[in-house]
Amino acid sequence: MNCFQEKQFSRENLLKMPFRMVLTGGSGSGKTIYLLSLFSTLVKKYKHIFLFTPVYNPDYDGYIWPNHINFVSSQESLEYNLIRTKSNIEKCIAVAQNHKKSAHFLLIFDDVGDKLSKCNTLIEFLNFGRHLNTSIILLCQTYRHVPILGRANITHFCSFNISISDAENMLRSMPVKGKRKDILNMLNMIQTARSNNRLAIIIEDSVFCEGELRICTDTADKDVIEQKLNIDILVNQYSHMKKNLNAILESKKTKLCNSDQSSSSKNVSS
């Protein structure tokens, strides 16, 4: 008998302790839009947020300071930028400790691909980053991009309409409460029954699940989907670029306006 229950995901639980989250799904499945919906919660604790991505993604405008975005087009550039970021984190922690304060960091890797599975510094962060008050979020199109040597430390597995076989492979190393067979049956049941293609189905590890046999679900926020700017998300993060906040927000508004005009033109022509 499957004793698992479906529950609404509590985003506030992500603030309790460092986490390692994997968001897996195909292109256009809703991974990024859901991640952006988590920001209003995450910035309550994580004041230093860094993004690693191979190409510029305008979706992150207004969510992450430009000087905290690292473009990593090769294995070497990913390794280099991570080593440099780790050094900066260690310096920030030392300064915070001198002032009897704590600093918390979040590293996001968006569609970096198979470079993730070969990155030694990322594996170190997955396995030992808790000691640096660092949490990790990986956005991947397939579980294969999650480093094998770091899968045992994944705390949250977020499925966006992926195959059950892929979910099974991901869960093999992840420490979960209950039988994996029951988890997979429940996952399949929810994916089949819920018509929302962008539904996030979240499996927590044995610590974050709070002793419950549960699978959580969540959806992106309406304001994020409608691209409504929330200035507090940037304001609550540390950056040397805060003095340029107005210019950054104006740039974001201009891009949104141009996008809307382009969409309107297409509708008229069609």
From Swiss-Prot:
GO terms for molecular function: ATP binding. InterPro entries: A32L, P-loop_NTPase. ATP binds at V55, Y56, N57, P58, D59, Y60, D61, G62. Keywords: ATP-binding, Nucleotide-binding. Coiled coil: none annotated. SUPFAM superfamilies: P-loop containing nucleoside triphosphate hydrolases. Transmembrane segments: none annotated. It comes from the Viruses. The keyword ATP-binding applies. Participates in viral DNA packaging and virion morphogenesis. Belongs to the orthopoxvirus OPG160 protein family. Interacts with protein OPG137. This is DNA packaging protein OPG160. It comes from Vaccinia virus (strain Copenhagen) (VACV).
